[in-house]
């Protein structure tokens, strides 16, 4: 390391770039892992060598103490150091790549090394939508905070709220006088950032100002515990084997209804709604959709943590399609877990989402794939894999569903039903009898000498009509 430093030192001195040289010196000091500001009885070779170098650098006692107290550095100091480090590493990598190409000195081995280095830098520092930024690439051993404050802040518009994280315990009036450590549009992004960067551990106490949200301390603590359980820190070291291949998702944690109450009216009245309709996508006689949002937190093989948010009435379907498309694209199904800690029916909601993802994955990623019928409230969704991508056909009501089922098909395509779709209806029983190459006829006698006849053809289409009939025997003849 010292030999390498001497080469870099000569180069930067010749170019008169003292700031870059100081960064290299700080990196070498951190790598040496000695604390020269503290007296010690040990006079090992490493300490003696670093003392000699530090005298050459003209570092004073104050600078040594600052470097030796890195464990006390907080987010601000670490972020500033990281920004300079990222800028220098990126610049050096680009220069090295361009120099090698322009001078024709890159052989096959060097090309592989450069590729791995580029991917390592990309994984560690590249910024992209949804990616959780890592602010502490080994600069300080510990960024954890004993006390934090989490608050929802309102913007200019009614829907322009954001979430901010502050150091220490602050009251609501004190928030305006402090600069947040980080703020994000959505809560899951912020807590994922706090976890990935080690600001929050099991000992951290967080004061919560939920604003207009339904977030409670109970929910927040459980969300953080779920992140610690599924993405324990430190993450395993990134290997050359992993970097030599394209990144692929390894683990996915679905956080459902973060900071939301799916049944706010019953909560306000302190009531518990009991119904035989327990499906989270069609709850109670009103068939309420209790899945209001899903935040998908995914760790890939390059140790990148990403958060994707889906919200609104189609949140569950959109999250499901995103998961299936990525699993099919990478030919790999990431380990999936679901967590929900909202006020009403949280366990049932989490179980429902996990079952749905498992069932849909089994049907749509099979070879050959099946179509998948899902009922959300009183509407229906048909999921079908076409050209490697999950396609959605939305049908507003049962009449449109029956027209879809009766449309002619070019080839046999089995239709799998979600466990809650068409519950208690004979249509579901018929569709489950579908067989390639078989034509099946079903009938039901109705009042006023009428009969309902259903034909399930050899390609999986279901056609239905009504006609007059005198009795069952006449109908069958």
Predicted feature residues:
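Structured mid-domain segments that build the active-site/substrate or prosthetic-cofactor binding neighborhood
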Residues: 1-17
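Short, hydrophobic/amphipathic alpha-helical patches that form generic packing surfaces
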Residues: 6-9, 22-37
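C-terminal subdomain of alpha/beta-hydrolase-fold enzymes, centered on the catalytic histidine
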Residues: 22-25, 51, 73-80
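Extended, well-ordered protein cores
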Residues: 34, 43-48, 52, 432-433, ...
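Structured alpha-helical bundle/scaffold domains in large eukaryotic membrane-trafficking regulators
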Residues: 39-43, 65
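Eukaryote-specific, cytoplasm-facing alpha-helical/coiled-coil scaffolding segments in long proteins
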Residues: 49-62
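Long C-terminal appendages of very large multidomain proteins
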Residues: 56, 91-477
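Eukaryote-biased recognition of C-terminal alpha-helical segments
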Residues: 65-108
């Amino acid at each position: 390391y010292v030999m390498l430093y001497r080469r870099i030192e000569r180069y930067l001195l010749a170019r008169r770039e003292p700031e870059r040289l100081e960064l290299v010196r700080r990196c070498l000091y951190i790598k040496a892992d000695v604390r020269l500001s503290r007296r010690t009885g040990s006079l090992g070779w490493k300490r003696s060598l670093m003392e000699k170098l530090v005298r050459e650098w003209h570092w004073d006692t104050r600078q040594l103490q600052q470097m030796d107290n890195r464990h006390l550095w907080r987010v601000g100091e670490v972020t500033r150091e990281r920004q300079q480090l990222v800028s220098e590493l990126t610049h050096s990598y680009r220069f090295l790549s361009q120099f090698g190409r322009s001078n024709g000195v890159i052989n096959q081995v060097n090309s592989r090394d450069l590729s791995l280095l580029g991917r390592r830098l990309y994984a560690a520092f590249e910024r992209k939508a949804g990616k959780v930024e890592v602010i502490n690439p080994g600069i300080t051993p510990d960024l954890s905070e004993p006390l934090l404050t989490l608050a929802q802040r309102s913007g200019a518009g009614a829907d322009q709220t954001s979430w901010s994280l502050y150091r220490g315990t602050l009251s609501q009036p004190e928030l305006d006088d402090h600069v947040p450590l980080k703020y994000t549009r959505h809560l899951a992004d912020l807590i994922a950032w706090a976890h990935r960067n080690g600001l929050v551990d099991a000992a951290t106490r967080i004061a919560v100002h939920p604003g207009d949200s339904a977030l409670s301390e109970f929910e927040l603590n459980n969300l953080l515990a779920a992140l610690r359980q599924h993405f324990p820190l430190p993450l395993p070291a990134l290997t050359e084997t992993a970097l030599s291949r394209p990144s692929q998702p390894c683990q996915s944690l679905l956080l459902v209804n973060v900071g939301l109450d799916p049944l706010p009216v019953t909560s306000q009245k302190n009531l518990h709604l009991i119904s035989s309709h327990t499906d989270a996508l069609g709850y109670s006689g009103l068939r309420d959709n209790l899945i209001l949002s899903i935040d998908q937190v995914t760790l890939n093989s390059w140790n990148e943590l990403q958060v994707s948010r889906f919200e609104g009435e189609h949140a569950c379907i959109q999250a499901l399609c995103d998961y299936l498309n990525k699993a099919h694209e990478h030919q790999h199904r990431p380990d999936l877990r679901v967590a929900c800690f909202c006020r009403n029916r949280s366990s049932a909601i989490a179980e429902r989402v996990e079952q749905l993802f498992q069932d849909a994955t089994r049907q749509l990623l099979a070879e050959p794939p099946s179509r998948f019928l899902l009922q959300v409230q009183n509407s229906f969704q048909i999921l079908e894999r076409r050209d490697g991508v999950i396609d959605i056909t939305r049908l507003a009501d049962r009449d449109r569903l029956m027209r879809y089922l009766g449309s002619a098909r070019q080839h046999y395509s089995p239709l799998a039903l979600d466990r809650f779709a068409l519950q208690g209806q004979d249509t579901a029983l018929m569709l489950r009898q579908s067989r390639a190459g078989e034509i099946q006829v079903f009938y039901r006698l109705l009042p006023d000498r009428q009969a309902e006849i259903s034909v399930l053809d050899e390609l999986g289409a279901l056609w239905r009509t009504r006609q007059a009939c005198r009795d069952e025997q006449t109908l069958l003849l």
